[in-house]
Amino acid sequence: LGSYLGTTVGWRGAFLCLVPLAMAAFIWLWVSLPMMDIDKKQKPQRSVLRLFRVSIVPTGLMACGLFFMGQFALFTYVRPFLETVARVGPSGLSLILLAIGVAGFVGTMFVSTFLNARFYQTLIMIPLLMAATAGTLLLVGHSIWAVAILLSLWGLLATAAPTGWWTWIARALPEDAEAGGGLMVAVIQF
């Protein structure tokens, strides 16, 4: 939506159009989220690196890091691919990016069903399906409709995947989810 608005009214106009939505979301979250209890017990300060002693953490963080590297690498080249290979104009580009976003919203809504049924299989299948999607894009890059469908599938998977990784952190480190989350963010940003 932001890309489409940016094409039609400029990037400043796009930001201004989204301000009321952001304010509405802020107010809705303020009203609807429950207050969190404050843990007044002093927890000992420990190094986040101690989490690497938990056997599943190094492997999981490596898989998480590889997933995000692949996702960001592909996303970096989406626009140039669409403009040069698929020959998509500015309006089509905005619509395809909107389709990626809508598909991502849908994926985020439904990924919990798959995570609850087959957690690790879902975490494994998402990057495999994304890699297959990227490979197929190379084969059908000349067809705008095929590219739009494949990128929508990619958006569905790519946006749902972080939900799985945050769930993994909470399950792998139930007593240290905050520290594990910080470590995961550091791995992703590396």
Task: List the predicted regions and their residue ranges.
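Helix-to-loop junctions at the C-terminal end of transmembrane segments
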Residues: V106-F119
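Short amphipathic helix-loop junctions that connect adjacent transmembrane helices
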Residues: T76-S91
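Pair of pore-lining "gating" transmembrane helices in MFS-fold secondary transporters
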Residues: R53-A73, A148, S152-L156
